[in-house]
């Protein structure tokens, strides 16, 4: 019998527990993490395709290749970021496990950085306006991130620290969350991040419907996600390494916000509106 995605468990309030494995093909496990992670990439690509087709500049024909290249770069970047910035204490003794991305352990910030680099190189190669392309892409990216956080939930990583009460998420014994905090209820940090990502998605679509300078939608996306991630890190319990009193993800968020804010203001005064460029095209 194949395991269901959810099964009941007993707590003071009742609830459900999450399965890392959806089913097995022979001895090969099909992980909920990998399935949802790929679903996030596919959903992001389809959303970008729809937005760009409506835009009318023909950029939608690039989405398949663009998603493939940026998705692969994002996987590499997300894995390396997690290994070297979050879990090096473990991986320095288990080097052969670094390529095992299907087991979980991906840092969104590293994935976004490597994906952005790949995206810039792609747009430059095909002579596509990078800022305008990024503005159209931003809502699709944050939507994919939201689904990615559900992958973290199913895998029991990117978890919160104990709530101190009888409310929260209790993870299965096979997860890192359980190995770290046992059966203590934990803050649903990854769930809330996924939900806030959806709100950011709506905000970006709303903002992009009004006249704006090229690059401002993407800059706004970076600022909003940086704010979101900075504060949610106070609830995260999967790592505690601090630099100047802040976690590494918070330091990265501060840097990303400052850069995006400066770029946003610069574009406001020195940039050109996307509608002007479309009219000239």
Per-region residue spans from a language model:
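A feature for loop-to-transmembrane-helix boundaries and adjacent hydrophobic helices
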Residues: 3-281
């Amino acid at each position: 019998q194949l395991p269901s995605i959810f099964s009941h468990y007993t707590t003071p309030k009742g609830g459900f527990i999450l399965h890392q494995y959806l089913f097995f093909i022979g001895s090969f496990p099909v992980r909920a993490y990998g399935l949802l992670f790929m679903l996030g990439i596919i959903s992001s690509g389809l959303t970008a395709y729809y937005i760009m087709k409506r835009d009318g500049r023909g950029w939608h024909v690039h989405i398949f290749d663009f998603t493939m290249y940026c998705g692969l770069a994002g996987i590499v970047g997300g894995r390396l970021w997690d290994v070297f910035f979050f879990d090096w204490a473990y991986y320095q003794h288990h080097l052969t496990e670094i390529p095992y991305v299907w087991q979980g352990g991906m840092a969104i910030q590293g994935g976004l950085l490597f994906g952005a680099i790949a995206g810039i190189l792609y747009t430059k190669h095909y002579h596509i306006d990078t800022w305008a392309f990024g503005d159209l892409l931003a809502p699709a990216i944050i939507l994919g991130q939201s689904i990615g956080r559900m992958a973290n939930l199913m895998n029991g990583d990117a978890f919160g620290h104990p709530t101190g009460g009888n409310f929260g998420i209790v993870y299965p014994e096979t997860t890192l969350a359980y190995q770290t905090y046992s059966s203590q209820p934990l803050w649903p940090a990854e769930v809330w991040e996924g939900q806030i990502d959806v709100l950011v998605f709506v905000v970006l679509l709303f903002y992009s419907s009004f006249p704006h300078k090229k690059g401002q939608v993407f800059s706004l996306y970076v600022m909003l996600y940086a704010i979101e991630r900075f504060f949610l890190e106070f609830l995260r319990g999967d790592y505690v390494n601090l630099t100047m009193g802040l976690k590494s993800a918070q330091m990265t968020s501060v840097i990303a916000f400052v850069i995006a804010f400066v770029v946003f203001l610069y574009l406001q005064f020195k940039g050109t509106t996307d509608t002007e460029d479309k009219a000239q095209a």
